[in-house]
């Protein structure tokens, strides 16, 4: 299980991304618009730089909802591969059965 501090840090990042999502999208749209003047685009890039570092969505990490494991996490389930295996064998995930051919 991951340390609680790491899980809390990730939750804090999620909150920051949600808080600044609208501003981030506006700045990105202006900075990428070639029809805008160079001054406007430079101002948008500067605005992006002034946002908190953890407000950038690329800094988010997918973690297992149960264990907090950062690697081997399936997006569809939100669980780590080991937990998916345990839960599937126990019959706790509907529609998943052990392969047999």
Swiss-Prot record:
It holds the Pfam family Ribosomal_S14. Transmembrane segments: none annotated. Keywords: Ribonucleoprotein, Ribosomal protein, RNA-binding, rRNA-binding. GO terms for biological process: translation. Binds 16S rRNA, required for the assembly of 30S particles and may also be responsible for determining the conformation of the 16S rRNA at the A site. Belongs to the universal ribosomal protein uS14 family. This is Small ribosomal subunit protein uS14. It comes from Albidiferax ferrireducens (strain ATCC BAA-621 / DSM 15236 / T118) (Rhodoferax ferrireducens).
